[in-house]
Amino acid sequence: SHFIIISPEYNGSFPGVLKMLFDTSRSHEIWFHKKALLTGVATGRAGNLRGMDHLADVLNYVKITVHPNKLPISAVNSVVNSDGKIIDNNTLKAINQQLDEFILWASLQTQPSNH
């Protein structure tokens, strides 16, 4: 199982409701040894870089392996239109590259044994 998490910036991190999801779920059964791809979005210039780092720490704690290419999307209101469609070609290319890398990376990873 794989997860793609697109997280907005919230006070320099990721939203607390997302942390609550990990805190209140049955971590071992749901999250352990899964893989995740992170994309951060923000209206500012950093694209939620700090939030993705915080989130990666939480994910690593619950034994989710995080893909190394975390994509920050800055000034999201200028790359996405009011219908939610991406209108910036460079952003679209970066997203497609990240997804292609994740698909390849996830397919090469092996599941740990249950010894």
For the regions a protein language model found, what residue spans apply to each?
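Helix-loop-strand module that forms the ligand-binding subsite of alpha/beta enzymes
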Residues: 1-62
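Glycine-rich phosphate/pyrophosphate-binding loop and the adjoining helix
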Residues: 65-115
